[in-house]
């Protein structure tokens, strides 16, 4: 299954790692791709990074793992058409 994780902090990375260990493809959405360079190298096969828009477009299931104050903006950047009809899990912290 393709999992899109919106948010690249500790929670988002931990969830992404868990889904990767279960054999899923995971894309982590971030505003700063450079921040995830080391994570991507360690995560290995099935892992990728992208913008919030690209991540929401990619995922069959979307995980929202942003800080509370960034959640509304992350959802706007993801694009409502990319979220429509998908399972969305909100673990906002």
Where are the model-predicted features located?
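Active-site beta-alpha turn of Rossmann-fold NAD(P)-dependent dehydrogenases/reductases
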Residues: 92
């Amino acid at each position: 299954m393709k999992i899109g994780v919106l948010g690249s902090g500790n929670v988002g990375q931990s969830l992404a790692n868990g889904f990767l260990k279960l054999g899923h493809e995971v894309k982590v959405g971030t505003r700063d791709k450079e921040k995830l360079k080391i994570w991507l190298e360690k995560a290995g096969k099935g892992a990728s990074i992208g913008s919030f828009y690209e991540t929401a477009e990619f995922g069959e299931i979307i995980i929202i793992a942003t800080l509370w104050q960034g959640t509304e903006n992350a959802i706007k950047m993801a694009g409502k058409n990319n979220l429509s009809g998908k399972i969305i899990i909100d673990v906002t912290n």
